[in-house]
Structure formats: C-alpha cells, structure tokens
Regions:
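Short secondary-structure boundary/capping segments
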Residues: 35-36, 115, 188-189
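Flexible, active-site-adjacent loop/turn segments at secondary-structure boundaries
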Residues: 114, 121-123, 146
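A C-terminal cap/extension of S-adenosyl-L-methionine-dependent methyltransferases
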Residues: 146-202
Length: 202
C-alpha cells in the first residue's frame, strides 16, 4: 500500500517492477527522449521536481529512491534537501551509490580500474562516512549505511590479472553463490564493498 517516488528513474525498470506491488509509483527523469516510452508503459514520470510539484500538488511519498543518481549530481546536498518536502513524516529515502572505498580502488589499488572509474561521468564518489555527512547536512537522520558487493570475486580477479572489466562473465566458472556471499561478507567487514545503500528519514 506504499507510494513511491523514484528520482532519476532512467528507463523506469525499477518503477515497472515496483508498480506491481506499490499503491502508486511516480518517477522523475531529465531525459526528454524517454517520455514517449513512459507513456507507452503507462507511467507518470516528470522531468524535474518543479513539474512534479505542479502536477501532484502537495502529494507526499512513503519511499523515495535514488539508485545510481546522487554521484551524477552537481549539487547532491541541495537536491536531497529539495526532496524532503515530498517525503512523508514517517517515510524513508533509499540511496544507492558506488563506494569510493571499493576494494579495487583502495585495497588492491588496481590502476586500470582506477582509470576506468575516474574517467566515468561520476561527479562525486562517496564513502560511508561522507554519505552520512551529506545526509545530515541535508537535514535527514541516517537509519543505516550498508555495504553491498555487486561484482563477484571473479570480476576482481580478472581486473587484477587482465586489467579489464566483465570478468564475472568471462570467468563465470568461478561463479558461486556461496563464494560470493563469503567474499561480500569479508569486504563488508572491512568497508571495501563496491556499493553503498543508505536509508534516511526526517
């Protein structure tokens, strides 16, 4: 029965899944070329928060999500603050970002991976600490910041051996759920997973 706002929804893959279980889903996406796609699949997606406010008035949401979005924003603190009025008093914001303390960057110091990462379109890289600080500066309480490892050990080994991506596909023979869970648990314990997921509230 929850309502959801996905900020920076891209092609709306998550919204389409959420639509099956949420009472109402709404998106914000700046890419104009996707508007025809949103209409085709029956989604309400606005180009910015101003347009959302105009059409949805004072509507507030149980959950606001930002998946792989915050690191692309020129002023993430301001944007988080602007999202606050759209969040219900007992709602939460879920943020997913790459971890600046990714093991390949800071533990293994893989130069090809560093070049691959730092030449991307990310304007910011967050650690668990800087993500917490940003949330507090934007006026939120932090419920948690979790370490999540998206890429497998085979991906990391391939980067270290070959200096290239897609190791999880090319060396898929090393793929094992048990192995991945153990690797993720160990990286999380020392703060070096590749992804951070945070929950914020008012």
């Amino acid at each position: 029965n929850n309502t959801l706002l996905d900020f920076g929804c891209g092609a709306a893959g998550f919204l389409l899944k959420a639509k099956k279980i949420a009472r109402k889903v709404v998106g914000v996406e700046v890419e104009k070329r996707l508007q025809s796609h949103f209409k085709q699949v029956g989604l309400q997606v606005f180009q910015d928060l101003s347009e959302l406010r105009t059409h949805m008035k004072d509507e507030k949401y149980d959950v606001i999500t930002l998946f792989s979005v915050l690191e692309h924003l020129a002023d993430p603190r301001t944007v988080l603050g602007e999202l606050s009025p759209f969040l219900k008093d007992d709602g939460q914001i879920i943020i997913e970002v790459p971890n600046a303390n990714d093991a390949l960057l800071t533990l293994f110091k893989c130069e090809p991976y560093s070049q691959f990462t730092y030449w991307s379109c990310h304007l910011f890289l967050f650690t668990a600490e800087t993500l917490r600080d940003l949330a507090v500066q934007a006026g939120f309480s932090v419920n948690y910041v979790k370490q999540i490892q998206r890429y497998t050990l085979s991906n990391h080994l391939y980067w270290l051996a070959k200096g290239k991506p897609r190791g999880h596909e090319i060396w898929s023979f090393l793929g094992s759920e048990v192995l991945h869970e153990a690797y993720e648990k160990q990286l999380a314990a020392i703060g070096h997973c590749d992804t951070l997921v945070a929950s914020l509230s008012k």
